Amino acid sequence: MDTWHDALGGEKQQPYFQEILNAVRQERLSGQIIYPPAADVFNAFRLTAFDRVKAVILGQDPYHGAGQAHGLAFSVRQGIRIPPSLLNIYKELETDIEGFSIPAHGCLTAWAEQGVLLLNTVLTVRAGQAHSHALLGWERFTDTVIRQLATHRKHLVFMLWGGYAQQKGRLIDSQNHLILTAPHPSPLSAYRGFFGCRHFSQANSYLSRHGIDPINWKL
């Protein structure tokens, strides 16, 4: 199993998946603003090939502000103000990774291109309404993504931040992969243990131990 098509082709033919796409399409046609734009919904898969995934960072649903979401969890387009959770991720990187300095942008495409799958468990959202598409069925699809990676790949790093993401740990065999957990980087919880978690250096140590090139986290 080498490609996302191999891993997910059957899933995308399932009636529930077609129903999700139709529901989102109908909302867009009715004039509802949906993020990210239609062309960006599956960017995480476009930028990070199945056989090149090294690490998975799980988000919840996309940013719901104008111009923010572009299909990668926690990431925003160049020129968009860095959101608070991402700024806290940068602050942790600054203390964890030697030579990392906080960039002036929040675009994480460079990570995705190196094999960091930035996966939101829900892939769309209505403008200004967090979790508005939480019940559409996206999680059934993204649970399959996690399960397929955990089953058909070896020595991946899964970063699960916050209770919601940590529920997905049940889909992953910790004998074959590294599961790193911490509180969410949100300003509400970052000081309860996200700061100081050192997940990024731990990820690189694990990858190196298994003969896999580490990730250059610098942006």
UniProtKB/Swiss-Prot annotation:
- Principal localization reads cytoplasm
**Protein name as it appears in the record:** Uracil-DNA glycosylase
Q: Which GO terms describe its cellular component?
A: cytoplasm
Active-site positions, per UniProt? 61
What is this enzyme's EC?
3.2.2.27
PROSITE patterns for this protein: U_DNA_GLYCOSYLASE (PS00130)
Which GO BP terms, alphabetically?
base-excision repair, AP site formation via deaminated base removal
Which family, according to UniProt?
A: Belongs to the uracil-DNA glycosylase (UDG) superfamily. UNG family.
Q: What HAMAP family does the entry give? A: UDG
What GO terms are given for molecular function? Answer: uracil DNA N-glycosylase activity
Q: What class of enzyme is it?
A: hydrolase
Q: Where does it reside?
A: Cytoplasm
Reaction(s) catalysed by this chain, per the record, are: Hydrolyzes single-stranded DNA or mismatched double-stranded DNA and polynucleotides, releasing free uracil
User: What PANTHER family does the record point to?
Assistant: URACIL-DNA GLYCOSYLASE
Protein function: Excises uracil residues from the DNA which can arise as a result of misincorporation of dUMP residues by DNA polymerase or due to deamination of cytosine.
Checking Pfam families in the record gives: UDG
Which keywords belong to this entry? Cytoplasm, DNA damage, DNA repair, Hydrolase
